[in-house]
Amino acid sequence: MQQTYDTVRQLLEAGKTAEAERLVLQELEVVPNDATLLYLQGRIGAKRADWQGALNAFNRAVQLDPDSPAREARQAIEEILAFYHKDYYNP
């Protein structure tokens, strides 16, 4: 599975978001409760400015692994939304 994580990270760094998303979704079909895959799914959502999708993925990742880097990523998105969309976002 580590190879999959590394491949997804490389695809994201190369700007190949669609390919990264396909791979993550394919793997989530097999292992739906993988916190790292969910974290990566959240990163893909954030890269696309799909804030709700990113938050959903990060929340699921944190539920599965409270020490996941998704916790910090989720907090960063919440801060972005609170700053730019005060009228839409009220935590």
Predicted stretch roles:
Residues Q3, R71-P91:
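Terminal, low-structured helical/coil segments at or just beyond the last alpha-helical repeat
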Residues P32, D65-P66:
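Short coil turns that delineate tetratricopeptide repeat
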